Design a protein with these regions (language model features):
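Soluble catalytic domains of enzymes that build or remodel membrane lipids, polysaccharides, and related
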Residues: 72-207
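Membrane-embedded alpha-helical bundles of multi-pass enzymes
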Residues: 1-73, 114
Length: 207
């Protein structure tokens, strides 16, 4: 699963969403469930051996019964419901980074968001803003102010480039209200309202 770019594609644990083993997910995560699959396969192999049959069946029974019981447990209790709106511009990849398309692309997302302002959170795709963050400040300020006025938060992906260090980052930034009690628009360039992706992936956003 690590052959493509080092990212865990199609890990074994994802295959157990409907099985009793998924009950272990809140405790050991997807990687732990992958390990349990290997253990389970070993146990099933040992079942065919007369000397290890009884022990293998007992351990397998305990493993899957434990998973089933854990799956019945409610691990989190929702405290509040939040409404989320998502905008997908479906911009063709061939036009994504064409400078002449910057304006039309950003206009598309602005228009798509007009019907979403009443949500608690609005989500734009990873490269919704096709300009480097330092060059997109007027547009980001506009979205930031509007989101604040509408009492909501908007998160979007954008590429940031540091001219001093010659480093580029694919960032997730927050515009508008990061917290409900914020007294002013949250976004500032190079503020801590961002998360920089640590691993780039060869995937597109066109649906």
């Amino acid at each position: 699963s690590w052959m493509l770019t080092g990212f865990p594609w199609l890990s074994l644990g994802y295959s157990q969403l409907e099985s009793p083993l998924s009950g272990f997910a809140p405790i050991i995560g997807e990687t732990g469930i992958s390990a349990l699959i290997v253990i389970s396969a070993t146990l099933f192999a040992l079942i065919h051996n007369k000397r290890t049959f009884a022990n293998a069946v007992l351990v397998a029974l305990c493993l899957f019964t434990s998973g089933y019981l854990l799956k019945q447990h409610t691990w989190v209790a929702p405290q509040k419901n939040y409404s989320v709106g998502m905008a997908q511009g479906n911009i063709a990849q061939s036009l994504r980074w064409v400078p002449e398309q910057d304006g039309p692309t950003m206009d598309t997302y602005w228009k798509l968001t007009e019907s979403l302002w009443d949500n608690d959170l609005i989500i734009w795709p990873e490269a919704a803003v096709p300009k480097l963050e330092p060059l997109a400040q007027p547009y980001l300020a506009k979205v930031n102010e509007r989101a604040f006025q509408e009492n909501t938060a908007l998160i979007t992906g954008i590429v940031n480039y540091n001219w001093e260090t010659d480093e580029a980052w694919n960032n997730l930034i927050v515009l508008g209200k990061r917290t409900p009690d914020a007294a002013y628009p949250d976004y500032q360039y190079f503020h801590n309202n961002r998360f920089s992706k640590h691993h780039l992936l060869p995937v597109g956003e066109f649906v």
